[in-house]
Amino acid sequence: MIKLLKFYQDRGIKIIKGEGQYVWDEKNNKYLDMHAGHGVAFLGHRNKVIIDHLKKQMEEISTLSLAFDTPIREEMIKELDELKPEDLDNLFLLNSGSEAVELALKIARKITKRRKIVAFKNSFHGRSMGALSVTWNKKYREPFEPLIGPVEFLEYNNVDSLKSITEDTAAVIVEPVQGEGGVIPAKKEFVKSLREVTEKVNALLIIDEVQTGFGRTGKIWAYQHFDIKPDILTAGKAIGGGFPVSAVFLPNWISEKIEEGDHGSTYGGNPLAAAAVTAACKVAKSEKIAEQAQKKGELFMRILKEKLEDFKIVREIRGLGLMIGIDLKVNPSIAIKVLQDEKVLSLKAGLTTIRFLPPYLITQSDMEWASDATRKGISETESKRVAS
């Protein structure tokens, strides 16, 4: 019998359905889902608005090349216009975050006629060849070298390191909050300096918002926390409300230099994807999801800090909006397993961080549940550390 390749460690439970911020396993156990498909389900599982738009579109046409116009794309553009990144009036739709990063890197090389890309230590931008080339973790990169280069990795949140960005740099790619790297928010001084340096040497600034974008951090786009504007922005995950969609946003001065055949995607911008983005935009506006993420994120961080303040192995609780990391002084795997046993799903970030990526629908009661489970997980981690 054919078998699925396993690139992920099996979590040992079979999920059969989801709704809102919860999922259920085959034994009908209910879980608070703060894994959320690596953050995809920010608008909640089985969001009714998303489902209704997808059902309607499936009854009309589900696949169509971007060579042909169709009404749902026109509606999507109208709904997205209010939420688009400032001055980035052009977009191309793809299917995954890695694909969006690939296109952003291609555009940077074409526009600048330069080759070098600058990225940052602890970054994660994807696992396809180009995206992997600007991803820091050597475990991901080394088996597939040589990759695309030259790429130079600088210290994140270190203004002095930006001196390495010179006139041979095509682009700098950066996450406003490093997700896989440990849920590390960028410092405002760092981001503003980065924008100044890239402008000085005419290098493009690519902001990777595949995980941070579409409201999760308390703004529709996380770069808006830093009073700067990017040259290119990549988006994904939440923008499709659970449907696989990603996007690259560009300003007019770049789009004018893009030519037929520079890129393409068989499924990119298909009618179902356009319907999903249309619906997601409606939810984002009607539910004020960014404002909810900001308020709920602040409350969740406060509850976590109160519940975990007496643990010596907790190094830091950090994050932005509903992108939260609990950084330990030890491996968090035991705590993540205990959380799952307590019916709270989370994921690891970096070497020592528990990552929470809940849907915006999370309630204070959910936060208390998660915080109590986290306390139990860290307590067990601490006990086993002492015993060993």
Swiss-Prot record:
Listed EC numbers: 2.6.1.118, 2.6.1.124
Binding sites annotated in the UniProt record for pyridoxal 5'-phosphate: F124, D208, E209, V210, Q211, T266
UniProt keyword annotation of Amino-acid biosynthesis present: yes
GO molecular function, one term: transaminase activity
Needed cofactors: pyridoxal 5'-phosphate
UniProt-annotated binding residues for substrate: R127, S265
Cofactor note: Binds 1 pyridoxal phosphate per subunit.
Classification via Pfam families: Aminotran_3
InterPro entries xref list: AcOrn/SuccOrn_fam, Aminotrans_3, Aminotrans_3_PPA_site, Class-III_PLP-dep_AT, Class-III_PLP-Dep_Atrans_LysJ, LysJ, PyrdxlP-dep_Trfase, PyrdxlP-dep_Trfase_major
Annotated Gene Ontology cellular component terms: cytoplasm
GO BP term, pick one: lysine biosynthetic process via aminoadipic acid
Pathway stated in the Swiss-Prot or TrEMBL entry: Amino-acid biosynthesis; L-lysine biosynthesis via AAA pathway; L-lysine from L-alpha-aminoadipate (Thermus route): step 4/5; Amino-acid biosynthesis; L-arginine biosynthesis
Main location: cytoplasm
Reaction(s) this enzyme catalyzes, per UniProt: [amino-group carrier protein]-C-terminal-gamma-(L-lysyl)-L-glutamate + 2-oxoglutarate = [amino-group carrier protein]-C-terminal-N-(1-carboxy-5-oxopentan-1-yl)-L-glutamine + L-glutamate; [amino-group carrier protein]-C-terminal-gamma-(L-ornithyl)-L-glutamate + 2-oxoglutarate = [amino-group carrier protein]-C-terminal-gamma-(L-glutamyl-5-semialdehyde)-L-glutamate + L-glutamate
Assigned keywords, A-Z: Amino-acid biosynthesis, Aminotransferase, Arginine biosynthesis, Cytoplasm, Lysine biosynthesis, Pyridoxal phosphate, Transferase
Subcellular location: Cytoplasm
Domain of life: Archaea
Positions of modified residues (N6-(pyridoxal phosphate)lysine): K237
Main function: Involved in both the arginine and lysine biosynthetic pathways.
Quaternary structure and partners: Homodimer.
Entry similarity comment: Belongs to the class-III pyridoxal-phosphate-dependent aminotransferase family. LysJ subfamily.
PANTHER family, per database record: ACETYLORNITHINE AMINOTRANSFERASE, MITOCHONDRIAL, AMINOTRANSFERASE CLASS III
Protein name: [LysW]-aminoadipate semialdehyde/glutamate semialdehyde transaminase
